[in-house]
Structure formats: C-alpha cells, structure tokens
C-alpha cells in the first residue's frame, strides 16, 4: 500500500497495477468509482491523492508524463451524474479530497478548499464565523458542485448563488504541455486573460480549465438564526390530474412572490410510491421575522389543503437527496405566541435544519435531466407529467418505479438581480428548476429505466424540439424555459443539435463563447476533457474542421 514518501511532495500516488491478487489495495474499488454506480474507471492506472496546492501541480505534471491529454480526470466529491470522471478513457485520477484547509485571509477573505464537502465547509464557516454559502444541501457533494458548478439551495432566493459571492480562486493550470504546471490566484478584479480565467470559474464547471485548490469570498451572508419548515405529504389515492395542476399553479405563484426567505422543494414521486411530498422553508434572523414566518406557513398550509388534505408522514422517501424528508414526528418547539402550526411543521435552529436536510441518498444507479422554467407549465406538460408518473412502463414493475420522480425546486429572488453575463451562470430569469430522476439497482435494468426518463423528457419538450430550448416559439409563447442546468449533466442533450455544442448552448446560453475563449487560453491542449467539457474551438471553427 502506498505511503507518504520521506520527502513529502504534497501528494501520494497509488499504482493500480502494483498490488497482488492476495494483497489488493483496499482503496482501489472506492477510488475507481463515483457516487452513481453506473460509472467505473475500468482502465485507471494511477491515482494521485493530493494534500497541498503545490502537490496538485506536481501530481498533474507527473500524470502528464505518463498519460495523454484527455485521460487525466479530477475528482472531489465524486457525485457527477454522468461518466465525466470515471469512464473507459481515464488513465489517471487526481483526487483532491486531501485539500481541506479553510479559514480567513486578511487580504483575500474567507476561503475553503476544493477537497472539502458541502457539510465540511458549512460546519467551518458557521462554527468559526457565523457565515454561510447559499449553496445546496447534499452533505457529501464536493465544493466544486456547490460553487463552480453553479449550485443553489434553500438560501439562494435570499442571497443569490454561491458564485455571486465568489471573489477569487486558486487554480493549477498547464497551458503549455512541455512546461511545469502553475498555481495561480485570480480574482474578481483580475484583468485580461486572468480575468477570463476567474470568470470561467463562476459557474463554468469543475475540471474544465485546471485543478481548483481554493475558493475565496471577500464577504459571505450571515447565517439565519432558524428556519420554519413544513413537511407536507400527499397520498396518490384519489388524487387527480386537475388537482396536480392546481397544486403546481399555487406552487408557481408562491415562487413568483416577494418572500425571498421562503423556498420550496416539491418531489412528485411516481404513483407507485403511494405518496409525494412538498417541503417549504422560511428562514428568519430575529423573533419578529420568526413570527411572520410561522404565520406565513400556517396560511400556506391552509391554502394548499383547500386542494388536497395532507396525510400523515409515513417514511423517508428514496432518491438522490435534494432536501431529504424529515424524521417522522420530530419534537415540536412551540415558543411563539401562536399555537396553530401543524404537526408536520417545525421550528429548527439553522444548524439543526441543515443537519436534517443534508442527506445524499443511497448509492444507486441513476439518470437525471433538468430544465429551468420562467413560466408555469403549459397544459400539455401537465398531461405528460400525469402520464409518466402514473403509468408503469413495459419491463418494470410498480415496485421498481418507486424511486422515479420529478423534482420541482423553487428559486428566483436575488438570483434575478445579477446580470446574465456577470457570471458564467446565464440563467437569471428562472423561478423553477426541474430535476427528472430515476434510480435502480441492477445493470440489467439500465435500458428500460433510461428509456422511461428519455421518453418522459422528450415528450415534455416535443413542441420545443425535444429539449427546453429558450428560443423555440410555440403557441404557449416564447421564453417558457431557460435551458438546462450544467451541474445536472445529461449526455442525451448531445443528440439535439451540433453534438455537445448544442448541449453547452442549453447550459450556458450566451456565455458559451467566453467560456470557449478561456478554455483556449488556459487549457489549449484539452488536458481536461469529457463528453460535455468546454471545447477550445467555437462552433464555427469546429464545423470548418469537419
């Protein structure tokens, strides 16, 4: 088993082929597979585990002495939905999970390291400074997903995206193959090529331009004091298509309101699960805001119950964690003047709420798709949702559909107050983000599960060319959608038009060309590449080479 050498270069290297059958390295199965059990790096020869930023430089140089561009991948949390890290092409992995330093720099501000997870950084920022990143909730997802991937979460309506607060990054780049890698610090005020490199990290995705080692924030929002949380379960028994439309209409109306501290997660599980669930969260910072939040939830719940009476919580539902269900019957804390909050409604200190909702779900085989929505669902889409969440496809049983769902996340608010080109995240009009999900256990069920989610998605967007194209004019109007979310990658989008350029257009809209410019400057040899990585050629240049 590999150990740190006497002269520590800031990394260790694990030679996959050095073990023997009777004494295999116990780390290798974990080092060669991501969270999605569909993806395994079957041809990996070396794993470099880095512990210092300079070690990341050296590890990249050593890897490139043995491997060709495009066969070295970076891993942190390992939650990538597609095989962008673990596929048959990868020969070397640079694992940055040893980079976990965090703190405060007098010149650069708060910083967290790229090897840390959402939960690790939350504990540090909250414990030491009372600050938070307004990112997602899945505890084991690496910071690349929550920051450079354009992540968002329950505080995004109130504070915007994490990239809106990003002020600097420390990143290893290797623009010249024959020269040593360089550790650079670039920031919001950087100009020229350095400015393009910083901007590319404000949502341009991890593993595209170099190896990120640290993220810096000149300032961060203060943590809320607490959160009022409603956990509303609905039975499929007796539920109708029209009731679903009414419920979604109310949900969209709430998303358009001015209550930036209120956010929702609506997980519509397949009928086979027998129930589905809506979570509503309102954060507060003082007693006055707390009473307003409690009163708001009382009226929201009463309004929703006019459509359908909530049922008792029964069990934690499966799936890749968004904001995971609460435990059954947590202890209530009624300390306000009112006492009419439902049993499913809780008053949590912010730290406790974050602990409650930060699950990542079980490691399964999975497939995902996404869409940003500016307007309500057209009637035709309600019909499609009802069809695919109530019918059991050929080749699957009802029991095997229990972990299939459409997740409807509420956003807007401060996200809207940033220009589309201020960061690489161009989507600044959306109020809802959809995540289509399905999960299963066995490889022999891959094809039928993939067919179900692909058919669902294509039928949802059939009038728009099979994808949520922002530019397609139909009877319901233009601008219903704002493309797709890069952090929920979907290789099927490469089949839409112009290969991966079409997919990247849906992810980055008008920001794609500037990302291509940064790629050409800082990774011209495409060391870092995958099925949907940023290319070095524009679409016009690409077509000229075909």
From Swiss-Prot:
Record's keyword terms, sorted: FAD, Flavoprotein, Glycoprotein, Oxidoreductase
List cofactor names only: FAD
Q: How is it modified after translation?
A: Cleaved into 40 kDa and 29 kDa cleavage products, but the 2 polypeptide chains do not separate and seem to be physically linked together. The FAD cofactor is bound via a bicovalent 6-S-cysteinyl, 8alpha-N1-histidyl FAD linkage.
User: Which residues does the UniProt record annotate as the domain FAD-binding PCMH-type?
Assistant: 40-222
Q: Which Pfam families match?
A: BBE, FAD_binding_4
Q: Which PROSITE patterns match?
A: FAD_PCMH
State the top-level EC class. oxidoreductase
List the catalysed reactions: beta-D-glucose + O2 = D-glucono-1,5-lactone + H2O2; D-galactose + O2 = D-galactono-1,5-lactone + H2O2; D-maltose + O2 = D-maltobiono-1,5-lactone + H2O2; D-cellobiose + O2 = D-cellobiono-1,5-lactone + H2O2
Q: What pH-dependence text does the entry carry?
A: Optimum pH is 6. A second pH optimum was found at pH 10.
| InterPro entries associated with the record | BBE (IPR012951), FAD-bd_PCMH (IPR016166), FAD-bd_PCMH-like_sf (IPR036318), FAD-bd_PCMH_sub2 (IPR016169), FAD-linked_Oxidoreductase (IPR050416), Oxid_FAD_bind_N (IPR006094)
Superkingdom is Eukaryota
Q: What is its EC number?
A: 1.1.3.5
Q: Which GO terms describe its molecular function?
A: beta-D-glucose oxidase activity; copper ion binding; FAD binding; hexose oxidase activity; protein homodimerization activity
Sequence position, cross-link 6-(S-cysteinyl)-8alpha-(pros-histidyl)-FAD (His-Cys): 79-138
Check the record and name the Gene3D superfamilies matching this protein: 3.30.465.10, 3.40.462.20
* Free-text remark on how the cofactor is bound: Binds 1 FAD per subunit in a bicovalent manner.
Q: Which residues are glycosylated?
A: 95, 358
Q: Report the family membership.
A: Belongs to the oxygen-dependent FAD-linked oxidoreductase family.
Query: Subunit composition?
Result: Homodimer.
Briefly state the protein's biological role: Catalyzes the selective oxidation of C1 hydroxyl moieties on mono- and disaccharides with concomitant reduction of molecular oxygen to hydrogen peroxide. This results in the formation of the corresponding lactones, which typically undergo spontaneous hydrolysis. Hexose oxidase is able to oxidize a variety of substrates including D-glucose, D-galactose, maltose, cellobiose, and lactose.
**What protein name is recorded for this chain?**
Hexose oxidase
Q: Which organism is it from?
A: Chondrus crispus
């Amino acid at each position: 088993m590999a150990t740190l050498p006497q002269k520590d270069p800031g990394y260790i290297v694990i030679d996959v082929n050095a073990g023997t059958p009777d004494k295999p390295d116990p780390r290798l199965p974990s080092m060669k597979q991501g969270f999605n059990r569909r993806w395994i790096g079957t041809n990996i020869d070396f794993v470099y585990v880095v512990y210092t930023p300079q070690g990341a430089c050296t590890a990249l140089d050593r890897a490139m002495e043995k491997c060709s561009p495009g066969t070295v991948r970076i891993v942190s949390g390992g939650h990538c939905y597609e095989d962008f890290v673990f596929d048959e092409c990868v020969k070397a992995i640079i694992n940055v999970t040893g980079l976990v330093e965090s703190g405060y720099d007098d010149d650069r501000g708060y910083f967290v390291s790229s090897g840390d997870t959402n939960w690790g950084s939350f504990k540090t920022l909250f414990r030491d400074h009372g600050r938070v990143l307004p990112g997602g909730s899945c505890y084991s997802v690496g910071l690349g997903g929550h920051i450079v991937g354009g992540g968002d979460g329950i505080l995004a309506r109130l504070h915007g995206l994490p990239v809106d607060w990003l002020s600097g990054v420390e990143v290893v780049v290797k623009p010249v193959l024959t020269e040593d890698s360089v550790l650079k610090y670039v920031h919001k005020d950087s100009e020229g090529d350095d400015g393009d490199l910083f901007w590319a990290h404000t949502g341009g995705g991890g593993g595209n331009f170099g190896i990120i080692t640290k993220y810096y924030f000149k300032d961060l929002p203060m943590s809320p004091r607490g959160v009022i949380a409603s956990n509303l379960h609905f039975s499929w028994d007796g539920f109708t298509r029209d009731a679903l439309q009414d419920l979604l209409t109310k949900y969209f109306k709430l998303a358009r309101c001015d209550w930036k501290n209120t956010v929702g997660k609506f997980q519509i599980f397949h009928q086979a699960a027998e129930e589905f669930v809506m979570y509503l969260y309102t954060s507060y910072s003082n007693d006055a805001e707390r009473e307003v939040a409690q009163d708001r939830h009382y009226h929201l719940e009463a309004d929703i119950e006019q459509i359908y009476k909530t049922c008792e919580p029964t069990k934690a539902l499966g799936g890749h964690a968004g904001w995971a269900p609460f435990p059954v019957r947590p202890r209530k804390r009624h300390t306000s003047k009112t006492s009419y909050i439902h049993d499913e409604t809780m008053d949590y200190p912010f730290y406790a709420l974050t602990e409650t909702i930060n699950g990542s779900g079980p490691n399964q085989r999975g497939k995902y798709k996404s869409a940003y929505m500016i307007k309500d669902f057209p009637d035709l889409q309600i019909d499609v949702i009802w069809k695919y969440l109530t019918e059991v496809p050929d080749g699957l049983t009802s029991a095997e559909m229990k972990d299939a769902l459409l997740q409807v996340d509420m956003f807007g608010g401060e996200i809207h107050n940033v220009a589309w080109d201020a960061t690489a995240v161009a989507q600044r009009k959306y109020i809802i983000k959809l995540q289509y999900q399905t999960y299963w256990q066995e490889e022999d069920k891959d094809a039928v599960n993939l067919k179900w989610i692909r058919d669902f998605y294509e039928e949802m967007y059939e009038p728009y060319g099979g994808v949520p194209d922002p530019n397609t004019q139909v009877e319901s109007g233009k601008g219903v959608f704002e493309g797709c979310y890069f952090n929920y990658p979907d290789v099927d989008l490469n089949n839409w038009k112009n290969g991966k350029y079409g997919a990247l257009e849906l992810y980055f809209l008008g920001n794609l060309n500037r990302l291509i410019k940064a790629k050409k400057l800082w990774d011209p040899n495409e060391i870092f590449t995958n099925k949907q990585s940023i290319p070095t050629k524009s679409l016009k240049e690409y077509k000229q080479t075909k």
